[in-house]
């Protein structure tokens, strides 16, 4: 090959590589834009069918609760075992012994406690599932529509959850919890028979009105319900949140 032809060949190869790179970048941009819009709050890939409420976005509980109460403001209906366990935890906390709180050892917050932290979280809703991505300890909940995808799960910190719609309300039913988490920061207990129902309704584009119903015959005399409000946080980024197990340092 002559020097002139060699130069032309190199230019042709370079041009081809640039074209390939441009195509790849464009493809990535298209995929990225199809998952989330510029503010990160509008999914276009696998988005819910027309007419289905879309809860995708970043949300924050503006009134995080240290101690959960029922919808009428009363104390949860603890039974004798529940009162004894709660009193023991309260005494430890008041004495300054915070290592009794599972979160102090970097265990997961559990449900519904995750919903009452002062940290934001992302809801990503698709035609297949609903995903909650929490800033708190980078906790992730993958919730399928209507039924679980596999065998009966083992007990876990977050339980096993399925979602369905009740009109315009998103309903999430969870069970199969272990007993290693607290329901709130004050130490409300639960056992492995715990079931949790979350209900979320978009009352306007920036507000979710929610409720959480707790059923646990091991520690409560009856099911009870508490409420929460979530506010949309467009443009807010989820920060890195690394748990440091100070009890072992």
Predicted stretch roles:
Residues 2-9, 15-17, 22, 26-249:
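Hydrophobic small-molecule pocket/channel-lining residues, especially in calycin-type beta-barrels
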């Amino acid at each position: 090959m002559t020097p002139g032809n060699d130069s032309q060949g190199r230019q042709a190869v370079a041009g081809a590589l640039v074209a390939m790179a441009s195509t790849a970048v464009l493809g990535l941009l298209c995929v990225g834009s199809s998952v989330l819009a510029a503010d990160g709050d509008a999914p276009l890939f696998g988005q819910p069918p027309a007419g289905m409420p879309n809860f995708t976005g970043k949300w924050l509980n503006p009134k995080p609760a240290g101690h959960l109460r029922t919808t009428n403001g009363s104390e949860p209906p603890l039974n004798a075992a529940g009162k004894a366990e709660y009193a023991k935890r309260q005494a430890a906390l008041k004495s300054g012994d915070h290592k009794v709180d599972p979160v102090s050892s970097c265990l997961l917050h559990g449900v519904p406690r995750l919903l009452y932290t002062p940290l934001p979280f992302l809801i990503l809703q698709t035609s297949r599932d609903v995903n909650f991505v929490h800033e708190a300890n980078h906790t992730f909940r993958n919730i399928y529509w209507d039924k679980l995808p596999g065998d009966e799960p083992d007990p876990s910190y977050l339980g096993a959850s399925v979602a369905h719609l009740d009109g315009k309300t998103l309903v999430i039913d969870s069970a199969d919890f272990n007993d290693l988490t607290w329901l709130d920061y004050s130490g409300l207990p639960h056992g492995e028979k715990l079931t949790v129902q979350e209900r979320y309704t978009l009352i306007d584009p920036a507000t979710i009105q929610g409720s959480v119903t707790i059923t646990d015959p091991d520690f409560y005399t009856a099911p009870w319900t508490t409420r929460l409000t979530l506010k949309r946080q467009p443009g807010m980024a989820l920060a890195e949140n690394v748990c440091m197990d100070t009890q072992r340092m």
